[in-house]
């Protein structure tokens, strides 16, 4: 059975910064709980299309980005103190600068997994009535469990709630990490796209 999960987060940062943060694969382990000890095991990068040139020089962000066709294998511990690591092989299937990108699982814990990240400019009013430019970040997951009825039971009892907790954690980490984002040389590659 196919399941969906959706999450939204408004961030007081411009689309260019938010998208660049999520398009940089080095940030993925930083968005996962520390107890998972997530790490990138392998990566084969495909360059994204040329980055649009922002009118505002402050938004001309130089950072690595994983374009459509990028394949990555990450591994992580499925629960605290786990002696095993779970490999997850995924590919960026679709990529459009400052709009969206989607990744699909080729090998991993799910029978099917597609995760689309999308951004759009959205201004909000603060407590003082001032208009703040920002970005609405949307995550949409489509996934299927393995192991038939047993997998569906696990989804009902554990997995659905765990996905919600992981995305709540991601939102907290995103809010903490975005103010620290500085374009810098990648540790994965010296090539900046």
Predicted regions and their residues:
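Hydrophobic ligand-binding cavity/cleft-lining segments
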Residues: 1-58, 193
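Short, highly charged C-terminal tails/helix-capping segments
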Residues: 40, 173-193
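Glycine-rich portal/gate segments that line the openings of hydrophobic small-molecule binding cavities
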Residues: 40-107, 126-127, 181-183
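Beta-strand/loop substructures that line and gate deep hydrophobic ligand-binding cavities in soluble
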Residues: 102-165
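Generic structural detector for well-ordered beta-strands
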Residues: 8-12, 91, 118, 142
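Substrate/cofactor-recognition hotspot
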Residues: 170
């Amino acid at each position: 059975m196919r399941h969906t999960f959706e999450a939204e987060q408004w961030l007081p940062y411009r689309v260019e910064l938010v998208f660049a943060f999520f398009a940089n694969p080095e940030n993925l382990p930083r968005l996962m709980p520390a107890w998972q000890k997530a790490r990138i095991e392998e990566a084969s990068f495909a360059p994204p299309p040329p980055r649009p040139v922002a009118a505002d020089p402050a938004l001309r962000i130089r950072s690595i980005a994983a374009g459509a066709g990028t394949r990555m294998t990450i591994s992580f511990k499925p629960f605290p103190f786990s002696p095993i690591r779970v490999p997850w092989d995924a590919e960026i299937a679709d990529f459009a600068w400052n709009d969206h990108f989607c990744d699909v699982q080729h090998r991993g814990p799910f029978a099917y997994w597609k995760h689309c990240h999308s951004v759009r400019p959205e201004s909000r009013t603060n407590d003082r009535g001032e208009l703040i430019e920002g970005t609405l970040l949307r995550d949409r997951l489509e996934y299927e469990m393995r192991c038939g009825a047993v997998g569906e039971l696990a989804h009902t009892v554990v997995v659905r709630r765990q996905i919600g907790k992981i995305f709540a954690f991601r939102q907290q980490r995103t809010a903490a990490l975005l103010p620290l984002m500085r374009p810098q040389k990648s540790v994965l590659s010296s090539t900046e796209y």
